[in-house]
Amino acid sequence: MKFIGKLLLYILIALLVAIAGLYFLLQTRWGAEHISAWVSENSDYHLAFGAMDHRFSAPSHIVLENVTFGRDGQPATLVAKSVDIALSSRQLTEPRHVDTILLENGTLNLTDQTAPLPFKADRLQLRDMAFNSPNSEWKLSAQRVNGGVVPWSPKAGKVLGTKAQIQFSAGSLSLNDVPATNVLIEGSIDNDRVTLTNLGADIARGTLTGNAQRNADGSWQVENLRMADIRLQSEKSLTDFFAPLRSVPSLQIGRLEVIDARLQGPDWAVTDLDLSLRNMTFSKDDWQTQEGKLSMNASEFIYGSLHLFDPIINTEFSPQGVALRQFTSRWEGGMVRTSGNWLRDGKTLILDDAAIAGLEYTLPKNWQQLWMETTPGWLNSLQLKRFSASRNLIIDIDPDFPWQLTALDGYGANLTLVTDHKWGVWSGSANLNAAAATFNRVDVRRPSLALTANSSTVNISELSAFTEKGILEATASVSQTPQRQTHISLNGRGVPVNILQQWGWPELPLTGDGNIQLTASGDIQANVPLKPTVSGQLHAVNAAKQQVTQTMNAGIVSSGEVTSTEPVR
């Protein structure tokens, strides 16, 4: 019996020595190489680490150094200087579920197709790590990341798991090519729902704070978002800049505050922007709300050729439409002011009062083409209940027929300027007058115009102007049909008899001042020459009592003989 006892003792000592030897051997480079090779050969993963460390002061912790881990045939998912694995009694029933995993000084490379990792942890901690996810939905890259996930149960394509609490900070981060620094993220994951209870970052030389939630269908609910002192330059057009907002199923905003922002793109810019938006939901190219509000002001706004100074907008949104409480801006050296309502039903914009004063505006070269284009889908009708203009300078630099109105004043009532997405003067009345004008190099003084319009005709009851010594007076009518049949009757007294030469009528065989009478008609159609449609008659008498009558048919004038109005003696 003593022999058997000694034998068992020797065997136990040998086992303890072997275990101790194996324990120390596994912590050598040889042990690390053999463990790495065994895992790589007997699983679908490749593993390599430089050394394994275990200390009796922390008996439940195993530390792997210089670790590389990933799926076979794919780039490494994890590269870390140190991986600290804390074990627990759970390993008896779930060997791959550990208590804590601490990753230090390394990089996690993630994609939407990342295969499920073969282990879990009650807590995943990151210390001075980096994230790279270039081909995922969010195109994420982050450096100096610290934080954790509780619990951590990774799934295929969901490296953080399907249900967990998250807390991260990052020294720098880039999300969809938008860089940020000093980032803080706190929240939770519940299957495909991501809740960010606390979000903060330094972005574009400013700050961003808020909280939001991303739902399973990809829609976002932003309860509160505040951006201050943003200074952002973008290479994208304004449409492309906001394209990501249209790519989500819907975006619900509880409160958005923008303070002192400066944004700039290739053909747009806004400086010193203050914006407050509340209770709005955007879906594709539409919006919904019960009680939405937008208040916005800026020092300067540029979009293409539109350049506004000190614009102020205050609006209220409802299911029925938009109440424009205030819009004011300095524009082209003057001031623009209006208020009104946009009605969703009928897509009608009704401006209660519109005032333009002090403008010095040159019309775009293609303004006639723009006038003939249809309006956007949201603007089926535009109505002005009241309109006023004061001391405006309007210039058209068309080389074929340049003109200018100086000190233009006017007023109008119940004007309909858009119907069925077409520009025009479809109803209402207007009166315009100016201190001076030039029409194709012909100077006149105090031109004035009075018109009324209905669904069938635009009637110009007064059209007059003073020349150097005389006066021109006319009446006209323009039909509302696509042909735009136009009739005009013009009388001139004490005017140059060839004053109409600059306006399209051939030179008369008369000289000097006199009286003229013109009746003409034609069709002012889009993309159709005017001259071939014009027919009319011109009668002129000069101060020498010479007279001539000419007739125009299809734009061609038949020459008339010059006769005398004096009786034959």
Curated annotation (Swiss-Prot):
It is found in: Cell inner membrane. The chain crosses the membrane at residues 7-27. It is a single-pass membrane protein. Residues 1-6 are cytoplasmic. The keyword Glycoprotein does not apply. Keywords: Cell inner membrane, Cell membrane, Membrane, Transmembrane, Transmembrane helix. InterPro entries: AsmA (IPR007844). Disruption phenotype: The mutant does not exhibit growth defects and does not show outer membrane permeability defects. Residues 28-569 are periplasmic. Belongs to the AsmA family. This is AsmA family protein YicH.
